[in-house]
Amino acid sequence: MPKRKAAAPNRAFKVADQIQRDLTELIARELKDPRVGMVTIQAVEVTPDYAHAKIYFSMLTGDVTETTEALNQAAGFLRNGLFKRLHIHTVPTLHFLFDRTTERAADMNALIAQAVASRSKDD
């Protein structure tokens, strides 16, 4: 049996990018859960078989645990919305994870500022 040709390597990136755009719109316009406030989708990682997608998000205010729980409970609703928009055979199961990158960057900036301030005091 001949080998099946592998999909283009950047197709997964294109699908992830489209999922990110569509999810941003779905959350902002159609999700009515009060536990979900100002959520920003930072990144989407799709498995090679498109069965699962990790959705990394950040938020300005609110409880991280509560928002993560609300988004994971709404995953079926959001997946159904993606099914109507995407034209792929399998719409992935969505797994929402809080992205702590911005928090870590702020902590690093504070540490750098502290080091610079202590260095200038030493001079």
Curated annotation (Swiss-Prot):
GO MF, one example: ribosomal small subunit binding
An example GO CC term for this entry is: cytosol
Question: Hey, what's the signal peptide range on this chain?
Answer: none
Q: What is its main location?
A: cytoplasm
Whether Iron counts among this entry's keywords is no
Classification via InterPro entries = KH_dom-like_a/b, RbfA, RbfA_dom_sf
| One GO term of the biological process aspect | maturation of SSU-rRNA
Locations listed in the record: Cytoplasm
Keyword Cytoplasm assigned: yes
* Biological role: One of several proteins that assist in the late maturation steps of the functional core of the 30S ribosomal subunit. Associates with free 30S ribosomal subunits (but not with 30S subunits that are part of 70S ribosomes or polysomes). Required for efficient processing of 16S rRNA. May interact with the 5'-terminal helix region of 16S rRNA.
Q: Report the family membership.
A: Belongs to the RbfA family.
HAMAP family per UniProt: RbfA
The name on file for this protein is Ribosome-binding factor A
Biological source species: Variovorax paradoxus (strain S110)
